């Protein structure tokens, strides 16, 4: 009974699970079930969101991988273009095409590749590309878009025409092969400009410095205003005839004049070097092109900075004009000072350290200091082109002498190679851009007016200035030289880089497209016709620059030398006695040139090698007198002889020592016998970079 009773008592408990007395126990169970159900449903939703996130991540990875492959293909295209250009140059070394140069052929290669990319290869645009319209008063540089609670950042690419809204994303590869303009200014231009200064032929450059400065400064300004005025007339005509679809002001015309006033006769100079054209003509063209690029870029910056007072920012204002002139002078002088200062700092570092014992570090420091000049000037609001140009000249004059022999060869070859690759890359890219740039604006009236303007602007530059310069020059600039300089006004890398730097507006797009056509025409027609023009103008070729004065009477040679050197005689003495000993290991010790009160400073700043040089020159505390015998100095493959005082040549040499010393330094660097009074100064380890030209475009300093 007990067991039965025990079982009965348990029975109601089992029945009570579903009975009325146990209903309060069901509520927690229902709650538990509900929580489990909704939790399971939420888990399903969460897994769906995770799946979508994973799908988006996979899509992003695929897009990144596809973009990487496409970028690699684009770079491969340019590498193949450069390879083809190098092979073409090698072929032209053996068989020259009379009316075609390598640079023109590089542009043709770029045109063919651009044509294939434009019409032969179609990369479908992303289906997610959407065109959104919104009313804003200005174009923001950065745009944040909220997509389902996620914010995405978009950057401004530039203005496009309304009829191209549906074609912007038509070909992804065309957008990929169009580089950011800053790539040209920060990567490609610095080695080209630096090499121009580093390989400058100083003797011929300084002998014609007055004429070069006149052509570069006055001539570029004249050309800019002539072209700007003519183009303003064309723009006015276009407005009257309804051909102008956007704003185009007089300041835009002046900016276009500054852009196309930048000459780059790289093709002509290469042919001049191969044919050994008259050195005076070569010096005038090369010097003008070197400084002309610097003047053109500073002039364009000054025009952009032109801001008259009042609401209309495009009216003429005298105050704003003088302000722009002040900006021009300030930017140019500041850039010049910054470039020279960087060269001086590099010279001091290489002099007072023992980096020459570690050639790799020495070359690396030289390279980085030289390149940083461009970026430093741009960061401070100056012009990097001017800064890096004068940095190259300063480095060649001072720093080069402090480098070890191996580093001297390395720096010469490094910048020669970079210059060669950068120039050919730009010419190939020019041809490519004609088809890959998607915002071209071609107007026949503007194009024809531009061609007429550049010819008239070049003529207004060369002929009037040559007439004025001949009034004060002993060696006149002949009419055949003037015609050749007029013909050699090619446009190239600098004009292209200035034009492509800003293509955000309708006016800038038209200027860029027209500049591209001008570059093509001048390189192909004028560059290809250089040889024929030399023959037509009867300009002598096969001239050895080192033998140019053979056959000239001695009295005329001395007179010409004195006239060409008197402006620089004071600078030469200051440089030889103070700057060279301070910045290099050469020259007389500062202890002998500075006043006695500066003795401690002079001893601190004088290189020990300078004392060694002085000890080699001393002979029992007496100056070395060149009277009792002959002395010969062998340097490389040449020998310099000094005969007895009764010989006529040494008498001439002694009689005009200051002018001769200056001319010889500008000619041979400082590996020479420099006679100052009766002391024989023999600078040691002091040379200028005599470059072995690889690309026939920039050449060794004399």
UniProtKB/Swiss-Prot annotation:
Disruption phenotype: The SLC9A6 null mice show a 10-20% increased mortality after birth, yet the surviving mice do not display any obvious difference. Behavioral tests reveal a modest motor hyperactivity associated with coordination deficits and limited ataxia. Neurons from these deficient mice exhibit endosomal hyperacidification, as well as impoverished neuronal arborization and attendant circuit dysfunction.
Organism (species): Mus musculus
Protein modification: Ubiquitinated (in vitro). Glycosylated.
Name of protein: Sodium/hydrogen exchanger 6
Taxonomic superkingdom: Eukaryota
Protein encoded by which gene: Slc9a6
Membrane topology field: Multi-pass membrane protein
A Pfam family per the record: Na_H_Exchanger
Reactions catalysed according to its record: Na(+)(in) + H(+)(out) = Na(+)(out) + H(+)(in); K(+)(in) + H(+)(out) = K(+)(out) + H(+)(in)
């Amino acid at each position: 009974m007990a067991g039965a009773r025990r079982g009965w008592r348990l029975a109601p408990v089992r029945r009570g699970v579903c009975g009325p007395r146990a209903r309060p126990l069901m509520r927690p169970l229902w709650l538990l079930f509900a929580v489990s159900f909704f939790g399971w449903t939420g888990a399903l939703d969460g897994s769906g969101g995770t799946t979508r996130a994973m799908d988006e991540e996979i899509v992003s990875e695929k897009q990144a991988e596809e973009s990487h492959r496409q970028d690699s293909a684009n770079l491969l295209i340019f590498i193949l273009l450069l390879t083809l250009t190098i092979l073409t140059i090698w072929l032209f070394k053996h068989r020259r095409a009379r009316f075609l140069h390598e640079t023109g052929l590089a542009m043709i290669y770029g045109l063919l590749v651009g044509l294939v990319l434009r019409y032969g290869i179609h990369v479908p645009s992303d289906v997610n590309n959407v065109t959104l319209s919104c009313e804003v008063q200005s174009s923001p540089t950065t745009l944040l878009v909220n997509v389902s609670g996620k914010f995405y950042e978009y950057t401004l690419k530039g203005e496009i025409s309304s009829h191209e809204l549906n074609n912007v994303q038509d070909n992804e590869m065309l957008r990929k092969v169009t580089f950011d303009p800053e790539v040209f200014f920060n990567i490609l231009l610095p080695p080209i400009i630096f090499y121009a200064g580093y390989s400058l032929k100083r003797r011929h450059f300084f002998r014609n410095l007055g004429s070069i400065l006149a052509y570069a400064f006055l001539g570029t300004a004249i050309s800019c205003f002539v072209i700007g005025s003519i183009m303003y007339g064309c723009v006015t005509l276009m407005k009257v005839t309804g051909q102008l679809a956007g704003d185009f002001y007089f300041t835009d015309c002046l900016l276009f004049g500054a852009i196309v006033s930048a000459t780059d006769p790289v093709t002509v100079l290469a042919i001049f070097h191969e044919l050994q054209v008259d050195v005076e003509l070569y010096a005038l063209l090369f010097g003008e092109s070197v400084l002309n690029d610097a003047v053109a870029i500073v002039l364009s910056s000054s025009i952009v900075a032109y801001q008259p007072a009042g609401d209309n920012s495009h009216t003429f204002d005298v105050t704003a004009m003088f302000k722009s002139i002040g900006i021009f002078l300030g930017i140019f002088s500041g850039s010049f000072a910054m470039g020279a200062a960087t060269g001086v700092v590099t010279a001091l570092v290489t002099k007072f350290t023992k980096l020459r014992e570690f050639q790799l570090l020495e070359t690396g420091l030289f390279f980085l200091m030289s390149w940083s000049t461009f970026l430093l000037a741009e960061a401070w609001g100056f012009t990097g082109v001017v800064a890096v140009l004068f940095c190259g000249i300063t480095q060649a004059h001072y720093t080069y002498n402090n480098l070890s022999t191996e580093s001297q060869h390395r720096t010469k070859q490094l910048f020669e190679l970079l210059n060669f690759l950068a120039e050919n890359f730009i010419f190939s890219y020019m041809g490519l851009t004609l088809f890959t740039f998607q915002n071209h604006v071609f107007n026949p009236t503007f194009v024809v007016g531009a061609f007429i303007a550049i010819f008239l602007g070049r003529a207004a530059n060369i002929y009037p200035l040559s007439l004025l310069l001949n009034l004060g020059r002993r060696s006149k600039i002949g009419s055949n030289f003037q015609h050749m300089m007029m013909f050699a006004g090619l446009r190239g890398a600098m004009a292209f880089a200035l034009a492509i730097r800003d293509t955000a507006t309708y006016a800038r797009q038209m200027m860029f497209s027209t500049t591209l056509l001008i570059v093509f025409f001048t390189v192909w027609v004028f560059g290809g016709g250089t040889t024929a023009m030399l023959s037509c103008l009867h300009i002598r070729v096969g001239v050895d620059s080192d033998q140019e004065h053979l056959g000239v009477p001695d009295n005329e040679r001395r007179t010409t030398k004195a006239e060409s050197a008197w402006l620089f005689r004071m600078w030469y003495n200051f440089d030889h006695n103070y700057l060279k000993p301070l910045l290099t290991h050469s020259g007389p010790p500062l202890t002998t040139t500075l006043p006695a009160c500066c003795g401690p400073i002079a001893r601190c700043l004088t290189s020990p090698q300078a004392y060694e040089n002085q000890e080699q020159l001393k002979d029992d505390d007496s100056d070395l007198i060149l009277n009792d015998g002959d002395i010969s100095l062998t340097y490389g493959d040449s020998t310099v002889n000094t005969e007895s005082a009764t010989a006529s040549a040494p008498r001439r040499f002694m009689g005009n020592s200051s002018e001769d010393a200056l001319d010889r330094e500008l000619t041979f660097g400082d590996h020479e016998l420099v006679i100052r009074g009766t002391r024989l100064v023999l600078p040691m380890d002091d040379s200028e970079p005599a470059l072995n030209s690889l690309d026939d475009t920039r050449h060794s300093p004399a």
